[in-house]
Amino acid sequence: MSEKLKLHGFNNLTKSLSFNIYDICYAQSEKHRQEYIAYIDEQYNAERLTQILTDVVEIIGAHILNVSRQDYDPHGASVTMLIAEHEVPPPADSSEESPGPLPDAVVAHLDKSHVTVHTYPESHPDNGISTFRADIDVSTCGLISPLKALNYLIHSFDSDIVTIDYRVRGFTRDIDGAKLYIDHDINSIQNFLSEDTQEAYQMIDVNVYQENLFHTKMILKEFNLDNYLFGTGVSELNANEASNIRERLQKEMLEIFYSRNMPY
């Protein structure tokens, strides 16, 4: 499939890329935990997320039709963008006074091409570990590939653990009428990751090729305790404290990576 396919009519394939990105930290006191949540809330507020998604849309070569964003109380934010493969000119009657589109009309387009992000800061009630999760979905219809946004999104967040799902649905036809269920070569999401990303992460694939379903899990190879402490540093901890915190953080990260709780 290295050559460009000649299609009959519009490319009806829907390509969906989903991320779950986790940032883990240890905040020793309740005050530090609250400060971490506040920091994350500010660092990834709706305005910042809107800029990240705007960059994503530009990277994949799409055009923004509509933006909806919201910061939540006590914490968290979300942004949704409707996008199109080609720039959509305003309708001829856009300057006339008339009722706007019904919600159904907007949601109908959401089923085709959209970019969304939702954030979920949280903390353990008594062991000092706090996590931040960002869920990102990039769904496109047509020739646009969401895979182009892979590396940018991973590097836009403090990504300790990343879970990625990519699927292609629907079919399009070539000029002879034969159905095509995928229009590009892929055997792993890892093929689309930059070399520095591949070197930084340990990765596991679970792929169902016959269903055009690809799944990759990533966890940072290097563990530097100082990078995971919020409000304190390794120099302020004795050897036993540092060892205990390191063990708890690594256990937390492995549990999230494998999606299962582990015995103490």
Curated annotation (Swiss-Prot):
PTM notes: Is synthesized initially as an inactive proenzyme. Formation of the active enzyme involves a self-maturation process in which the active site pyruvoyl group is generated from an internal serine residue via an autocatalytic post-translational modification. Two non-identical subunits are generated from the proenzyme in this reaction, and the pyruvate is formed at the N-terminus of the alpha chain, which is derived from the carboxyl end of the proenzyme.
Catalysis performed (reactions): S-adenosyl-L-methionine + H(+) = S-adenosyl 3-(methylsulfanyl)propylamine + CO2
Active site: S113 (schiff-base intermediate with substrate), H118 (proton acceptor), C141 (proton donor)
Positions bearing the site annotation: Cleavage (non-hydrolytic): K112, S113
GO cellular component, one term: cytosol
Record EC number: 4.1.1.50
A single BP term in Gene Ontology: spermidine biosynthetic process
Signal peptide location: none
TM helices/strands, residue ranges: none
Location of Pyruvic acid (Ser) modifications: S113
Keyword Glycoprotein: no
InterPro entries: AdoMetDC_fam_prok (IPR003826), S-AdoMet_deCO2ase_bac (IPR009165), S-AdoMet_deCO2ase_core (IPR016067)
Family to which this protein belongs: Belongs to the prokaryotic AdoMetDC family. Type 2 subfamily.
NCBIfam families: SAM_DCase_Eco
Name this polypeptide is given: S-adenosylmethionine decarboxylase proenzyme
Originating species: Hahella chejuensis (strain KCTC 2396)
Lineage: Bacteria, Pseudomonadati, Pseudomonadota, Gammaproteobacteria, Oceanospirillales
GN (gene name): speD
